[in-house]
Amino acid sequence: MSRYRGPRLKKIRRLGALPGLTRKTPKSRSNLKKKFHSGKKEQYRIRLQEKQKLRFHYGLTERQLLRYVQIAGKAKRSTGQVLLQLLEMRLDNILFRLGMASTIPGARQLVNHRHILVNGRIVNIPSFRCKPRDIITTKDNQRSKGLVQNSIASSDPGKLPKHLTIDTLEYKGLVNKILDRKWVGLKINELLVVEY
């Protein structure tokens, strides 16, 4: 299955807030909510919705998510927490959390167009797994810095997680450590995703 490119607000209405997908928020439509979401939720439906939240928030395909679940299952720690750590340490997500991109798809585009350096090397793979003490910077040209400057100016510095630091003057971010569960920017029950 390919990456989702359709209407984003429809997904937000169905699944709830997905800050990585878009900054837009749907208008309140209480009548429609009662119409479509009546009745008891089955266990399968609950698990499917949690999985879809994770997929659409991080912009993953079905196959990528399955691969991350398999990697997390081999770890000795809690599978759900390892899964979230793997997803949060992706380069496109770290750019989004630093405020260098307004959404995760925007961060993917920055990486694909070779505007981002990790430890002084150009990285054009959005799923690149960052490690502690990685330094993330923009290319040293005006165009790259202009793209990141707009996003940094509009981002909220109070929402920066503890495992990341950013220098807004030099357009440089630093990964301090692997994140804790409480700093994940998405309300999700990761155990339901693993069970699915």
Curated annotation (Swiss-Prot):
Q: Which domain of life is it from?
A: Eukaryota
Q: Pull one GO CC term from this UniProt entry.
A: chloroplast
Q: What is its main location?
A: plastid
Q: Which CDD domains match?
A: S4
Subunit structure of this chain's protein: Part of the 30S ribosomal subunit. Contacts protein S5. The interaction surface between S4 and S5 is involved in control of translational fidelity.
Q: What is the native source organism of this protein?
A: Lygeum spartum
GO BP term (any one): ribosomal small subunit biogenesis
Gene Ontology MF, one: structural constituent of ribosome
Q: Which Pfam families match?
A: Ribosomal_S4 (PF00163), S4 (PF01479)
List compositional bias (Basic residues) regions by residue number.
Answer: 24-38
Q: Which family does it belong to?
A: Belongs to the universal ribosomal protein uS4 family.
| InterPro entries associated with the record | Ribosomal_uS4 (IPR022801), Ribosomal_uS4_bac-type (IPR005709), Ribosomal_uS4_CS (IPR018079), Ribosomal_uS4_N (IPR001912), S4_RNA-bd (IPR002942), S4_RNA-bd_sf (IPR036986)
Name used for this protein in its record? Small ribosomal subunit protein uS4c
Function as written in the Swiss-Prot or TrEMBL entry = One of the primary rRNA binding proteins, it binds directly to 16S rRNA where it nucleates assembly of the body of the 30S subunit.
Identify the gene encoding this protein.
Answer: rps4
Region: Disordered, residue numbers: 17-38
All copies of the S4 RNA-binding domain together span: 89-169
Q: Where is the signal peptide?
A: none
